[in-house]
Amino acid sequence: MYTRNLLWLVSLVSAAPLYAADVPANTPLAPQQVFRYNNHSDPGTLDPQKVEENTAAQIVLDLFEGLVWMDGEGQVQPAQAERWEILDGGKRYIFHLRSGLQWSDGQPLTAEDFVLGWQRAVDPKTASPFAGYLAQAHINNAAAIVAGKADVTSLGVKATDDRTLEVTLEQPVPWFTTMLAWPTLFPVPHHVIAKHGDSWSKPENMVYNGAFVLDQWVVNEKITARKNPKYRDAQHTVLQQVEYLALDNSVTGYNRYRAGEVDLTWVPAQQIPAIEKSLPGELRIIPRLNSEYYNFNLEKPPFNDVRVRRALYLTVDRQLIAQKVLGLRTPATTLTPPEVKGFSATTFDELQKPMSERVAMAKALLKQAGYDASHPLRFELFYNKYDLHEKTAIALSSEWKKWLGAQVTLRTMEWKTYLDARRAGDFMLSRQSWDATYNDASSFLNTLKSDSEENVGHWKNAQYDALLNQATQITDATKRNALYQQAEVIINQQAPLIPIYYQPLIKLLKPYVGGFPLHNPQDYVYSKELYIKAH
């Protein structure tokens, strides 16, 4: 067993092409290798174990590196690990780190740095928003540690020497190596944390093991990173600098793109028809494992009443929002997007009915709950500051006022304070977006489990939890999908959230940017793969 796995994996790694900034022969490069990226807003953190959203993850993917990375086709490739063995029927992994790995300050990176990072993730003292991620990966004792029932040192990960990391799972997880590409499972510098403790993640203290290091952070304007000469593959990293711009308005991003000040930006909805005509070679529409929805807070009335939640769920014109208000989106009826591997979406007949019938159903539910024209439903709709999110919020509030007579107040915040408010439960109905951290429906559905850190609405359903727990025991994708479909039916019936649309990657990319991934549905962009052609 050991020999067969080892030989297969050695062959896999040795056959893997050299991906880092694979510049085609005879391609002239620009003298200034700087990539300027519209990243929407400032990240909430750059601490790998505390990352919870793509805004931060995009930067952390450049500053740090895990055991593996995801190539432009969405396939797992060796990163800090040069190879690995899968043993005991998929319950034990042995990762062999590359020789000579260093942190950006020149200190050696060892397997113990991975152990520390993973232990930090599950340690309740860290308060990682992704602590449950290791439990979802079924790493031994992770769930017990997160629940405060076991010590962090009992986590199923250990360094058998400086270059060898052994991971023990409670059960086989077919997509386990894919999960390793998310920042929660990145290493952290043991020597820096020993010196600075929780302050290690302040910019003046941080060190990095990724292709870039933090150079400058102008709050709410931009973050600049420069090439890391200590990176394991620095000789193949072409970019010298990356700028992550905090442009929270798609029109501003578009205007700066047209002015030549941004190389990659999101597309404003109202400009899509014109862009398709004027810049067809620069508009990129890439399938993406993303779901946009609104979360109810079940700890606050009126949304502790399923009848009220269902009334709002039924009266959303998803087609209008996805294709008219925003454009190029797909109306969502399930939390899990149809692009997820092996998932077949469930069709709900009630959402296929004419809006007039759905409104009648919704009004009946509200009447049962005690709401009518003399006592209208009142609530607050909460979203983070961004013009496209505002368009969606306005459309939703208008629909609910039109169909149900609801009085909806809009509330918006900057990204960081928005995240803090959601975590504190300071909302009634709030916007949420989820991008898969691995290609399986459980990446989406697990966010609603009773013990999930992402379940900010505090919905609890024992039947739902049992279905997902049962699904983790099944390796057959078809049988697992049947359980996922049952879970989606419960979401439809209980409405802890309202699916709105599925969003592909819709961006403008300058034609002189080379190496950009066009087929990775998880939207992992590694700047080490990019280069700027002469233009």
UniProtKB/Swiss-Prot annotation:
Disruption phenotype: Cells grow better in the presence of the bile acid deoxycholate. Increased membrane stability when incubated for 2 hours in the presence of 4.5% deoxycholate. Increased cell survival in the presence of 20% deoxycholate. Disulfide bonds: none annotated. The keyword Signal applies. GO terms for biological process: bile acid and bile salt transport; peptide transport. SUPFAM superfamilies: Periplasmic binding protein-like II. This is Probable deoxycholate-binding periplasmic protein YgiS. It holds the Pfam family SBP_bac_5. It is found in: Periplasm. One of its GO terms (cellular component) is ATP-binding cassette (ABC) transporter complex. Induction: Repressed by the toxin-antitoxin system MqsR-MqsA; this mRNA is degraded by mRNA interferase MqsR. GO terms for molecular function: peptide transmembrane transporter activity. Probably part of a deoxycholate transport system. Its expression in the presence of deoxycholate in a ygiS deletion mutant increases intracellular deoxycholate levels and decreases cell growth; higher expression in the presence of deoxycholate inhibits cell growth completely. Bile acid detergents such as deoxycholate are important for host defense against bacterial growth in the gall bladder and duodenum. Keywords: Periplasm, Signal, Transport. Gene3D superfamilies: Dipeptide-binding Protein, Domain 1, Dipeptide-binding Protein, Domain 3, Periplasmic binding protein-like II. Belongs to the bacterial solute-binding protein 5 family.
